[in-house]
Amino acid sequence: MATKDPTAVERANLLNMAKLSIKGLIESALSFGRTLDSDYPPLQQFFVVMEHCLKHGLKVRKSFLSYNKTIWGPLELVEKLYPEAEEIGASVRDLPGLKTPLGRARAWLRLALMQKKMADYLRCLIIQRDLLSEFYEYHALMMEEEGAVIVGLLVGLNVIDANLCVKGEDLDSQVGVIDFSMYLKNEEDIGNKERNVQIAAILDQKNYVEELNRQLNSTVSSLHSRVDSLEKSNTKLIEELAIAKNNIIKLQEENHQLRNENKLILMKTQQHIEVTKVDVETELQTYKHSRQGLDEMYNEARRQLRDESQLRQDVENELAVQVSMKHEIELAMKLLEKDIHEKQDTLIGLRQQLEEVKAINIEMYQKLQGSEDGLKEKNEIIARLEEKTNKITAAMRQLEQRLQQAEKAQMEAEDEDEKYLQECLSKSDSLQKQISQKEKQLVQLETDLKIEKEWRQTLQEDLQKEKDALSHLRNETQQIISLKKEFLNLQDENQQLKKIYHEQEQALQELGNKLSESKLKIEDIKEANKALQGLVWLKDKEATHCKLCEKEFSLSKRKHHCRNCGEIFCNACSDNELPLPSSPKPVRVCDSCHALLIQRCSSNLP
């Protein structure tokens, strides 16, 4: 039997010890779940093992006083190969209390672990074998393949967070002895450990599933709240539309009443104009001798007639405008009714929340009361107008009666004149009697003239009253114009309500699309959750090949667990880190899980 090379046996032993220490440190640190400090036993053993690995095959350097065999020389060489390592070298040299090169090397290892760059630093050192040959023998661990394997194992330590106090420790005088009792365990401990690992994996899966359920519940609750708010706003818009419709109906009724009143006023004014025309004509025929004073009254009456005709034309134009506005309102109401009929199917489910809009109804009821008060004021104005028109008609009737009396007096005077002429021709003897009678008639005529003067004064007073009535009518036309402006403002408000209604309808459609998209996302997440519930943490013994690239595991190609799916992959197929719901810190995941998680995060973003 050929004897093995003792240096190769030493390298294999150190490699196995490095594997055990690194694996135990990672597993214990992950189960510990907190930042590691200097008193953590697995971490202390790891530094001891690394010190032995770096010391293997180290050349002895001679000095004037003694032999020097330390690992600080090759570690100090890292600064020249890796520029980022200059900071750690300078901080090690500046540390107080470090007197020996071994103490500096130990401090360097601790700082490199805290920076999570120990594997990068040592990888740069292993590549430069021509420089390492100055410090190590050809059979040293750092010069052979085992050194590359150990550097590959050190990459797994990047998941560990350590907070080591280097200033207060006595790194110069520590004795580096490997404690094998931490790695020699009986079968019961191994079984308990496997059970603990399985329980931890199950708990991780459970925590992940619970976190997914919480996220789904939060998204569903937020969507429900948004749907409720939109339903409330839609019900408010429906109520406002109904109120606007009622207001439009009331305004139409008021418009109809005003039109009827305007028609009555026009009829009365026409009758009044006709009566005044007849009166003026009779006055002109009966009182030709006193035409000068009556001509002035006639001109004034004609002016009044012109003014009244102009007022009638203005009123007719306003009525035509109101009729056209009424047609526009009817068209708008038809369009609104069509829209309301089309949206009734979508608004049936929203009518159950009408109780929440009572406050709005009360406010609108107050507005209705205010509009009713305005209507009452308008009705009072109309009643006043009717009273004024009644007064005018009564005055016109009195004028007609006076004119009839004057006509009768004129006819009697003409009859008497004819009789007088006949009597003069036939009876010359009775002239004195007739003269006396004529004197009596003259007295009567003088009294009649006095009566006519008084009647003229009364006519002038009546004309002044009619002028006042015309001024009142003008004021009333101005009020009608203001009412027209108010009607236009109400029409603008109705159009604004229509715009708001259409905008709310579009918002509801967009929210419906978003709800459908969110439902699809929830179904996808549920399917992913169902798929994740079936995942199991695969044991190291059961995997011999990488699941993705299907390459066989070896000393240089070691196994790595994916913290998401639990399968085992090589370093190339699992060189990704992402935070999972089960662990807030970034952990290793495979390429497929990395792509799935990135896609899920991007889909959740707005």
From Swiss-Prot:
It holds the Pfam family RUN. Residues 210-534 form a coiled coil. GO terms for cellular component: cytoplasm; nucleus. Zn(2+) 1 binds at residues 546, 549, 570, 573. A zinc finger (FYVE-type) spans 540-598. It comes from the Eukaryota. Interacts with BMX. This is RUN and FYVE domain-containing protein 2. It comes from Pongo abelii (Sumatran orangutan).
